[in-house]
Design a protein with these regions (language model features):
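Acidic, low-complexity, intrinsically disordered interaction modules
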Residues: 23-55
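Surface-exposed ligand/attachment interfaces on beta-rich extracellular proteins
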Residues: 1-9
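A short, Trp-centered hydrophobic/proline-enriched beta-strand micro-motif
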Residues: 14-20
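Generic cytosolic/nucleocytoplasmic N-terminal low-complexity/intrinsically disordered segments
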Residues: 2, 15, 45-46
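Short, flexible coil/linker elements and helix-boundary hinge sites characteristic
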Residues: 13-14, 41
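Short, structured beta-strand segments at or near domain termini in extracellular proteins/domains
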Residues: 55-65
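Hydrophobic beta-strand residues in large extracellular and virion-surface proteins
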Residues: 17, 28, 36, 62-64
């Protein structure tokens, strides 16, 4: 799925998503308007999360995880 679809899945559908570059147990999910959380419960500012994930490789390769 695309980056845009992954963001919508998290923010509108409440899903956890992972990218092909993530480890097998890694994911992110939306927490509120400004933060995501990861599989360890760490809060990640959205602007920081996407700030270091720029470029074509991050525009696709997303999936919903259980």
């Amino acid at each position: 799925m695309t980056k845009e679809a992954a963001i919508n899945a998290m923010e509108q559908g409440g899903y956890k998503v992972a990218h092909r570059f993530f480890g097998s147990n890694e994911y992110i999910a939306a927490c509120d308007d400004d933060y995501y959380y990861d599989e360890e419960g760490l809060m990640l500012p959205k602007k920081d999360f996407w700030g270091c994930r720029q470029g074509e490789a991050w525009n696709t390769g997303w999936r919903i995880v259980g």
